[in-house]
Amino acid sequence: MVEFKIILSDTRTGHSYKMDVSGGAAGALIGKRVGTEIDAAPLGLNGYKILITGASDRNGTPSRRDLPGSGRRGLLLAGGVGFNPKEDGQRARKSIRGNEITADFVQINAKVATYGEKSLDELLAAPAAAAE
């Protein structure tokens, strides 16, 4: 069974929320690409649309929006996602994943693109408060 940790950022308030998703809701994310806007109703966020901004696999390898496919590749990078050069002109070969979400991913980063009627605090904080 596929499980994802979704880090959802609310750009209005500056807060981020962690969601653990499995089963059918996680299956709805497979095949989507980094940079696409999806409906968040399968995640329990009715009326919301989220934009997938990034992801990382079980080894911590980040995905790049500009790399098609789902596999891991060794790229010679001069900056951007996956490498932060310390000097001008510095390059390094780094492992990077493609932009397609697969079952190998563990964490998916997203931000709210369209807001629903209820606030994220109401939708996401209520189950955690009831469990305590």
UniProtKB/Swiss-Prot annotation:
Gene Ontology cellular-component terms listed: ribonucleoprotein complex; ribosome
Native organism: Methanosphaerula palustris (strain ATCC BAA-1556 / DSM 19958 / E1-9c)
Family designation: Belongs to the eukaryotic ribosomal protein eS6 family.
Keywords from the named record: Ribonucleoprotein, Ribosomal protein
Name of the coding gene: rps6e
Protein name listed in UniProt: Small ribosomal subunit protein eS6
Gene Ontology MF, one: structural constituent of ribosome
Gene Ontology biological process terms, A to Z: translation
